[in-house]
């Protein structure tokens, strides 16, 4: 009996050491990927061809996404159907970087890092409310 108890304690010790060596998020697969904007430059304008699809994937109002992009890029523009037209020449790298920043600031939950969020307005303050964990965080105004 004493031998079995000693073996069990040794087994638990080895098991604890193995768990300490594992990373925190070992097999977590992300189900959300930041959508890429497909853009073309025509003259002095940049057209994001799939802007409506991008905003739908993010579950956000296209006007809100556009307002953020315009502010970050320092330009003017508008939405026409599924496209966004921006004044100026911007590469798809610049646009996709700004979309990634938008996702980090206005889509992903700051507590659980899930994209299951909605923007609500409480007492004249925009809040990011997570549907997964219930967390609420104030947002920067646009």
UniProtKB/Swiss-Prot annotation:
UniProt keywords, alphabetically: Initiation factor, Protein biosynthesis
Disulfide bonds: none
SMART domains named in the record: eIF2B_5
MF-aspect GO terms: translation initiation factor activity
Pfam families, per database record: eIF-5_eIF-2B
InterPro entries the UniProt entry points to: IF2/IF5, TIF2_bsu_arc, Transl_init_fac_IF2/IF5_dom, Transl_init_fac_IF2/IF5_N, Transl_init_fac_IF2/IF5_Zn-bd
SUPFAM superfamilies for this protein: Translation initiation factor 2 beta, aIF2beta, N-terminal domain (SSF100966), Zinc-binding domain of translation initiation factor 2 beta (SSF75689)
UniProt function note: eIF-2 functions in the early steps of protein synthesis by forming a ternary complex with GTP and initiator tRNA.
Assembly: Heterotrimer composed of an alpha, a beta and a gamma chain.
Family: Belongs to the eIF-2-beta/eIF-5 family.
Identification of the protein by name: Translation initiation factor 2 subunit beta
Organism: Methanosphaera stadtmanae (strain ATCC 43021 / DSM 3091 / JCM 11832 / MCB-3)
């Amino acid at each position: 009996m004493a031998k079995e108890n000693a073996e069990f304690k040794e087994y638990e010790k080895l098991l604890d050491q193995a768990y300490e060596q594992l990373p925190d998020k070992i097999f977590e697969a992300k189900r959300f990927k930041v959508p890429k904007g497909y853009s073309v430059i025509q003259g002095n304008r940049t057209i994001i061809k799939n802007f409506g699809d991008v905003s739908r994937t993010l579950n956000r109002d296209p006007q809100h996404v556009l307002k953020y992009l315009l502010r970050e890029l320092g330009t003017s523009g508008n939405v026409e159907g599924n496209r966004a037209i921006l004044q100026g020449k911007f590469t798809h790298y610049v646009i996709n970087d700004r979309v990634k920043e938008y996702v980090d600031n206005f889509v992903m939950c700051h507590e659980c890092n899930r994209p299951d969020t909605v923007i609500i307005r409480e007492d004249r303050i925009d809040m990011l409310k997570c549907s997964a964990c219930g967390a609420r965080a104030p947002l920067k105004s646009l």
